[in-house]
Regions:
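Hydrophobic anchor residue at the start of the ABC signature
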Residues: 10
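Conserved catalytic motifs of ABC-family nucleotide-binding domains
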Residues: 17
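Catalytic Walker B motif of ABC-type/P-loop ATPase nucleotide-binding domains
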Residues: 21-24
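Short loop immediately C-terminal to the Walker-B catalytic DE motif
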Residues: 27-28
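Helix N-cap at the start of a conserved alpha-helix in ABC-type nucleotide-binding domains
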Residues: 32-34
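H-loop/switch region of ABC-family ATPase nucleotide-binding domains
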Residues: 55-57
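Conserved beta-strand-loop-alpha-helix hinge in the C-terminal portion
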Residues: 75-93
Length: 93
């Protein structure tokens, strides 16, 4: 399944114990259970003092982040992770 392939890909990436993990849409096209599994892996990895650079379109992934960098029309804007979602959506609109 797609969920199993994503989990296996992340497990392979983590096998070498990197301190920085780059993830591009790690939970794209997955069902809700698989998405939450992937998010939990990311939470645990970060809790161990590691860094994740995560590209996502999923609002639900924002809570995984300590800092958000939003891209719009080729411009980047950095926000704190606790920025209200309404403000984020207004910026992106």
């Amino acid at each position: 399944s797609g969920g199993m392939q994503k989990r296996l890909s992340i497990a392979c990436a983590l096998a070498s114990r990197p301190t920085l993990l780059l993830l591009d849409e790690p939970d794209a096209a997955l069902d809700l259970v698989c998405k939450e599994d992937i998010r939990e892996y990311i939470r645990l990895y970060c809790a161990q003092g590691n860094t994740v650079l995560l590209a996502t379109h999923e609002e639900a992934d924002f809570d995984l982040c300590s800092k958000l960098i939003l891209l719009k029309d080729g411009q980047a804007r950095t926000l704190a992770a606790d920025t209200p979602v309404k403000e984020i959506i207004e910026y992106l609109s």
